[in-house]
Amino acid sequence: ILTSELNRTNASVLHITPFRSFPSGITASASKKSEYIRWANTSGGIIIEDDFASEFTVSTKNEDTVFSLEPTHSVIYVNTFTKTIAPSMRVGYMVLPKEFVGAFEKKMGFYSCTVPVFEQYVLTEFINNGNYERHLNRIRRKLRQLQK
């Protein structure tokens, strides 16, 4: 995404996949992420960061998300467990800036959750007891071995 071109539009929302962006497979550099943040700050825009599959990095250091770099709360972070646990685990999540929560609840509060409560409880326990992080670490080790 060329931010110079983005600045010439009336766009108020920018949807990005900074890790292995489809279809190019390119991961956004730190400077590109900073450009996105500058655009949001100067235009008053919102960034929706879709961070799916970022857990599959072969690097021993995780990539910084745009969400983690943006102190002014103009980034909505979304991700899913579909890629990291199983395709049948149709659970996604969104981290909203506090100022967006009320509007989200007002507009989306009437939608019913399609994820069974039991799956939500099992996933919560899997995360809370550290098994999810261990699972990701095993996958990353295997990916590094395959890359050699």
Model-based region annotation:
Residues E5-V13, A30-S34, S43, K61, ...:
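Bacterial carbohydrate/catabolite-sensing allosteric modules
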